[in-house]
Amino acid sequence: IHLAAVEGTSICIGSDCMLSHDINIRTTDSHSIVNLKGDRINPSQNVNIGNHVWIGLGSVVLKGSWVPDNSIVGARSVFTASKAIFSNCIYAGVPAKKVQDNINWTRERIKEKKI
């Protein structure tokens, strides 16, 4: 897991989270982007990961992101800042989008479907 928090920003990870291998969580773009007047237009922003979140293999969580409680970020996804995010969902893709709702996850391997 690679964490990059700079310029007074923070990465907050809630309780009972499961983080896979090769994850990158960043509050910064690493380099400044400026408009033609010379003003920086890409400030660093906090990252918040809720409680009971599972982040899959090779995923990237970018500045300004808030990953909601009880959610899953699919393998190799890029989670970016979003205004429409909901708990108990699976987010996947580049950029990550909601692909399933009304879910939760457990570390337990359940062998049979519960009816």
Q: Positions of the model-derived regions?
A:
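Flexible, glycine/small-residue-enriched loop-and-beta-strand segment within the central core
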Residues: 1-66, 77, 82-83, 94
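Terminal amphipathic alpha-helical/low-complexity segments used for targeting or macromolecular assembly
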Residues: 16, 32, 52, 64, ...
